[in-house]
Amino acid sequence: MSAKEIRFSTDARDRLLRGVELLNNAVKVTLGPKGRNVVIDKAYGAPRITKDGVSVAKEIELEDKFENMGAQMVREVASKTNDLAGDGTTTATVLAASIFREGAKLVAAGMNPMDLRRGIDLGVIAVVKEIKARAMKVKSSGEIAQVGTIAANGDATIGEMIARAMDKVGNEGVITVEEARTAETELDVVEGMQFDRGYLSPYFVTNAEKMRVELEEPYILVHEKKLGSLQALLPILEAVVQTGKPLLLISEDVEGEALATLVVNKLRGGLKVAAVKAPGFGDRRKAMLEDIAVLTAGQMISEDLGIKLENVTLDMLGHAKRVLIDKESTTIIDGSGEKAAIQARIQQIKAQIEDTTSDYDKEKLQERLAKLAGGVAVIRVGGATETEVKEKKDRIDDALNATRAAVEEGIVPGGGVALLRAKSALTGLTGENADVTAGISIVLRALEAPIRQIVDNAGFEGSIVVGKLAGSNDHNQGFDAQTETYVDMIEAGIVDPAKVVRTALQDAGSIAALLITAEVMIADIPAKDSAPAAGNGGMGAMGY
């Protein structure tokens, strides 16, 4: 076991704070409509240019192990906010840095860190309650477009495209984003289906950056039972290998020897394959497998129908233009099923919905209907260069996540105004002692941090703008950094999803409060490089 270096109290917190500030300084420049881009060097290919906070945070690894601990903790804030809300990562980082910075000062002044943490928790709970109370439901396609535009850094075409996509496939519909082969960004709605089953092994992953399987024009084998051995499957696997196309295997389960054999073949490059469990349970699973078979112009392989695995031929397999599989879901895009067959299946499900008296059955049938009839909206991102496409794709992903969050929990005034106005929830709120109350005041000050940063990035003085807004009784009034004017944020269409704002504050408060209570830090002592051997037996150059 290697020797450890230990840091205590103020020294430990100072090192943590330095790491937090380094990460915060790199991320905060991206905040707001006039936020700047960050250029990230890649091990291969062109550098990446992005304005996405979490993408910047994920790249930061510091040399000093103690400073790196602080940076990694705040990176966790950005990642968690991204996982839960899909946007607001820069706001979360700025909030976390502000809370920890103020908290570290008070701990250094002799206040109790545990009481400060209790105060921070109380403050965050009160503000979250206020944000939820002020959230307004999204009623129109125009409001969805506004949310998307703000999250895409003011790009109205992206906002409108996402609103159109949601119109076509519904708010809960499947919308995927992929790179186009042209310079234009376009929206396409294709026949498709998504179900909540992910890949059975991470070894099937083809896109390591996004941890997902991407299969182009695959064959699809739909099988009703479990697969424990591949013996019966060998003839059809060999036939698929001859075509050079990938294969998606959907069955009740793939386990043991069968799964191991598929993984080994995938790793060796002999067979491009992925396996997922069939969605649903019991009779519903069977019905959903039949839906998939109809959608992909394949046959469900079932012994009830007298079809055995060893007798399966290529023409019994389904086919689709593209399949995307991540850890939790599978999306089949543009299946080869005939429109008439799909429509007949849809009519059959509609008839079942009318006949059933069970609310539960009706709900599940409607889910199946939505999967078959809704289709999948595909946003194809175009650009002049690969770097431009990747940067635009980041913004579209953010905008898509933000609009979904807005539909879920409503919208609040954007530009940091919702957090600034939520300060009223902390007015008069006190704790059981002075230190707890001081913790509440840390949150009070932190609520100004995002709007100050947005204004600073626009080239103005944050204190002046915050002072002017504090003197206004209009809760929707804010500063439009794009036009450099004071406006009604809701009327101007500058809105944020309530879920994004709430999640950013909760995650920032949680991690920053933990950092404040840190008293000791332990890290490995870096290994000293062994001295290189001297040339010529240590005698130096001999002149020839």
UniProtKB/Swiss-Prot annotation:
Annotated EC: 5.6.1.7
Keyword Nucleotide-binding: yes
Subcellular location, record wording: Cytoplasm
GO MF terms held by the record: ATP binding; ATP-dependent protein folding chaperone; isomerase activity; unfolded protein binding
Catalysed reactions, semicolon-separated: ATP + H2O + a folded polypeptide = ADP + phosphate + an unfolded polypeptide
Major place of residence: cytoplasm
Positions bound to ATP: T30, L31, G32, P33, K51, D87, G88, T89, T90, T91, G415, D496
Record's function text: Together with its co-chaperonin GroES, plays an essential role in assisting protein folding. The GroEL-GroES system forms a nano-cage that allows encapsulation of the non-native substrate proteins and provides a physical environment optimized to promote and accelerate protein folding.
Family recorded in the similarity comment: Belongs to the chaperonin (HSP60) family.
Protein name: Chaperonin GroEL 2
Gene: groEL2
